[in-house]
Curated annotation (Swiss-Prot):
It comes from the Bacteria. Belongs to the bacterial ribosomal protein bL19 family. GO terms for biological process: translation. This protein is located at the 30S-50S ribosomal subunit interface and may play a role in the structure and function of the aminoacyl-tRNA binding site. Keywords: Ribonucleoprotein, Ribosomal protein. It comes from Edwardsiella ictaluri (strain 93-146). The gene is rplS. PROSITE patterns: RIBOSOMAL_L19. This is Large ribosomal subunit protein bL19.
Amino acid sequence: MNNIIKQIEQEQMKQDVPAFRPGDSVEVKVWVVEGSKKRLQAFEGVVIAIRNRGLHSAFTVRKISNGEGVERVFQTHSPVIDSIAVKRRGAVRKAKLYYLRERTGKAARIKERLN
């Protein structure tokens, strides 16, 4: 039974997910349905957390919009996600960057990773 579940989950996992880490700036293109129309919407921000659980993996992206912090949790292998593009690599020492929630402006900046 367990092997059947693993096999089905393996088939549903996306293969084209780029490698990214917390601190990286990413642009996630998401399919949005408005009435009868379907369009792509971009959400660009800093990855503050990653949850690796196979098919149930997720990551949290944070951005500042009109002076207000906005966080969105994306399921990594969701069919709603069209593409994930890494814009900038960040150098951080922690896996969860929740401390960025209290910081604003220049204090919330992340150094760029050179390698």
